[in-house]
Structure formats: C-alpha cells, structure tokens
C-alpha cells in the first residue's frame, strides 16, 4: 500500500508539518510516512507513531513508537500538549466508534494545526482501463465485490468517506476535501496490491462469492504489463483548526 499512496499522502501532509513541530500519526502501519515526518520535525520536535500492533513500524531516531487503541485510549494519554498535525490513513472506516472520534482529535490540535484523514471507500473503486484478455474486467469486478462484502462483514464502513467532511466541520475545523488516483500497469505497485491482498484474504474472497480459479486467473492478468488498472480513489480530508482572534 505504501508504494501506491505514499507519494500522494506525503504531498498532502508534508506542508502542514513545521520544522521543530509536533506530529502524531494514528494507525501508522509500517510507519513509512511517520519516518518522513520525524525527519521533518527533527530533534527539536516530536513525532509519534501509534498502532494497536507496532511491530511493523520501522524504527527512526526521532520517532516515538507507542501502542495505542484510538477507540479506548484517550489522545491525551500520548502527550497532554497539543499537536501541529495529526494524521490517520485507512483507519477510520475500520473503527466501530469512527463518528465519535473526530471531535477529540480536533480538540487535540493547536490553533492553526491540521487533522488529515485519508481513506478508501465504497465510492471510487478501481477498474480496468485496458486488457488484452476478455475476462479481466469481469474478474476484477468480482474481486472488488467480494472484497467489499468481506470488509463489510468485518465491520468496515465503506460509506464513512461520505460523512467525514461533515463530521470534521462539526468538530470546528475548516475542511478541504479532495481525491487522487492514477493508472497502473500490470506488475506495478498498483497491480501488485490486489494480488497481495487476494493472497492474504483468499479464503474470505471465496466465502464471499469469488471462485478460487477466478482469483488465480486475475492474479495472472495483473502480472501482465499490458493490463492497466485505474486505482482506487484516495479520499483526503484536511481540516484546519482556526486561530482565535
């Protein structure tokens, strides 16, 4: 995933992180963006990366790694001071209390600070732009349908992206929302991602209606450079806390 959306994500958040500032990343995954943020704030600042399982977060001399569950642990437990930037990517749609978590994050910002929430959802799924095979489009549609069905069964809310902007405004933030996507040829990161995902959750895809042979056939197609996918839309919600006066 990092290879697919890190360039976009870093382009969004990097201008919002001041040198020597305070940066908090929630659900940091491997910490690929958090490490860049740590470089930006430097020794004079503070960069914190959290997750419920931090074993995949790569170490960095200026990055503090903390085990933290956003649904149960107050943000103030991480540090009582306010933050210049707080970021979460592909996290909120998975959380059961997602709608109630925005306001506390807005409250944890310094005046002029930013909350960045990025996610994928049920709107803006990827699709096949070109393929030398007749079945690629149908197979990819089957994959997307089975994937979304599995995610729903696991508690993921694909409609979250339709509420995020409104919830951030209601939390007192000045919000700008935009999307980003690009095309990917077979064997490139954007095609390797569904291949990897289909391997990780193969049994779940089968349980939700995709034939095993169809999964294998789709993987073969996505390894062909002549196949071109349009990637999922990445939704970026950027909220700024107003400066009083």
Each PLM stretch: what is its role?
Residues 3-21, 36:
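Conserved alpha-helix/loop element of class I SAM-dependent methyltransferases that forms part
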Residues 18, 42, 95-96, 109-111:
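Helix-to-beta-strand junctions that scaffold the AdoMet/dcAdoMet cofactor pocket
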Residues 22-76:
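Class I SAM-dependent methyltransferase SAM/SAH-binding core
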Residues 75-86:
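A short acidic, Gly/Pro-enriched loop at the edge of an enzyme's catalytic core
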Residues 84-92, 118:
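Residues lining the SAM
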Residues 99-114:
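A short glycine-rich, Lys/Arg-flanked "PGG" loop and its adjoining helix->strand segment in the class I
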Residues 116-188:
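Conserved catalytic/acceptor-binding region of the Class I
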Residues 157-162, 174-245:
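Conserved Class I S-adenosyl-L-methionine
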């Amino acid at each position: 995933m990092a290879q697919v959306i890190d360039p976009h994500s870093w382009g969004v958040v990097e201008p919002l992180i001041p040198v020597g500032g305070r940066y908090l990343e929630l659900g940091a995954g491997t910490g690929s963006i958090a490490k860049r943020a740590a470089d930006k704030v430097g020794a004079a600042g503070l960069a914190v990366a959290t997750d419920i399982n931090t074993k995949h977060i790569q170490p960095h001399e200026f990055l503090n790694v903390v085990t933290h569950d956003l649904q149960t642990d107050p943000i103030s437990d991480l540090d009582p001071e306010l933050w210049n930037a707080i970021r979460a990517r592909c996290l909120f749609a998975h959380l059961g209390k997602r709608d109630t978590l925005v306001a506390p994050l807005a409250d944890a910002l310094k005046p002029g600070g930013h909350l960045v929430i990025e996610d994928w959802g049920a709107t803006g799924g990827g699709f096949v732009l070109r393929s030398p095979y007749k079945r690629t489009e149908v197979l990819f549609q089957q994959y997307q349908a089975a994937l979304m069905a599995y995610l729903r069964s696991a508690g993921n809310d694909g409609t979250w992206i339709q509420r995020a902007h409104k919830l951030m405004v209601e939390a007192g933030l000045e919000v700008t929302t935009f999307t980003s996507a690009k095309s990917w040829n077979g064997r490139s990161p954007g095609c390797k991602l569904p291949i990897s995902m289909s391997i990780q959750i193969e049994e779940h895809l089968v349980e939700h209606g995709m034939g095993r042979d169809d999964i294998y056939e789709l993987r073969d197609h996505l390894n062909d450079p002549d196949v071109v996918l349009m990637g999922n839309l990445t939704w970026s919600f950027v909220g700024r806390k107003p400066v009083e006066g």
